Regions:
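Alpha-helix boundary/capping motif
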Residues: 7-11
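Hydrophobic transmembrane alpha-helices and their immediate loop junctions
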Residues: 29-314
């Protein structure tokens, strides 16, 4: 109900009416304004909006597929293949799990890991330069993570298991145990002490600033590419022309093993060791362009490169 206040104008004796809100209505109005201001603040603040939304998982998987393909080609093609040509060898066959060269010097074996390290650093710089393009920054973050994890993983894998690229690099060097211990130690330092913390810190712009939200979003942004990359790499590796053993020691080891940091590093966000950052990216929304491109490239990767491509006859 509203009370009517009647005021008499001294000159015209006119009657002026005004409406005064009741006490209940006066109490209601500020609440409405407060709610509206909170809604506006949450819409304009990416960190707040992260608490109510989640990245599109299908797009995350698509980006992971493209990043997996590129990382593989960098390692096998540009790394091993480029070093083969640079050392005077003749490229023979390339697949998703091996590269055959007419000569097998140590540098050819080391070329894959060296390419991973170089391009991991390049992708780190590119991702930091992207301030608003969420999908592209996440793509380069994944490229950085895949490349650095594979590099550190190869050191560790060769040192502990005596299998892989760096086993060929140090073959014949004495004492054998010292080189294996050195490779294992290098793998532990690069993978667990350098690369995992670095990659997790670079993921912070996608996480928001609320503690529970950060951990939940980190699991989504790391587990999806981990599983996607592992499944794709293993499926393509199953068609390799050399030996079924390469499915285990190359395809599965490099993906499920080498990328395994993605499966657990989100747990490091508990506690104050890795604080949030002021820069927060927009949400990663669905992109049919990424999804369609990923499907086409995945088919070509499995059916084309999986069985191997002959580059030169022996």
């Amino acid at each position: 109900m509203r009370a009517i206040v009647e005021e008499h104008d001294k000159i015209g004796h006119a009657c002026k009416l005004s409406f005064v809100p009741s006490p209940r209505e006066r109490a209601t109005i500020p609440r409405m304004n407060t709610t509206t201001s909170k809604d506006a603040a949450s819409e304009s603040d990416p960190a707040r909006s992260f608490q109510l939304s989640k990245p599109d998982l299908l797009t995350l998987a698509a980006i992971a597929i493209v990043a997996t393909l590129i990382t593989n080609l960098l390692h096998e093609g540009l790394g091993h293949g480029g070093m083969c040509i640079a050392t005077g060898g003749q490229p023979l066959v390339i697949s998703t799990v091996h590269f055959a060269c007419s000569a097998e010097p140590r540098l050819v074996a080391a070329g894959g890991t060296l390419a991973n390290l170089v391009f991991g650093a390049i992708c780190w710089a590119v991702s930091r330069a992207l301030k608003r393009a969420a999908r592209w920054r996440y793509f380069f973050w994944l490229l950085m993570t895949f490349n650095l994890f594979e590099a550190g993983g190869y050191f560790l894998f060769s040192g502990i298991g005596n299998i892989g690229d760096w086993t060929a690099v140090v073959a014949g060097w004495q004492p054998v145990w010292a080189w294996r211990v050195g490779l294992a130690a290098l793998g532990v330092i690069t993978y667990f002490i350098l690369f995992v913390p670095l990659c997790l810190r670079e993921l912070r712009p996608f996480l928001g600033d609320a503690a529970k939200t950060r951990v939940r979003r980190a699991w989504q942004l790391t587990l999806v590419p981990y599983l996607t990359s592992g499944i794709l790499s293993t499926a393509a590796g199953a068609l390799n022309p050399v030996s079924p053993i390469l499915i285990l020691i190359s395809a599965a080891a490099a993906s499920f093993g080498g990328h395994s940091g993605l499966a657990w590093m989100a747990s490091l966000l508990h506690g104050p060791r890795i604080p949030s950052t002021e820069l927060q990216m927009p949400e990663i929304e669905r992109s049919w362009g990424w999804i369609i491109a990923a499907l086409v490239l995945a088919i070509l990767f499995i059916a084309g490169l999986g069985p191997g491509v002959k580059l030169h006859s022996v």
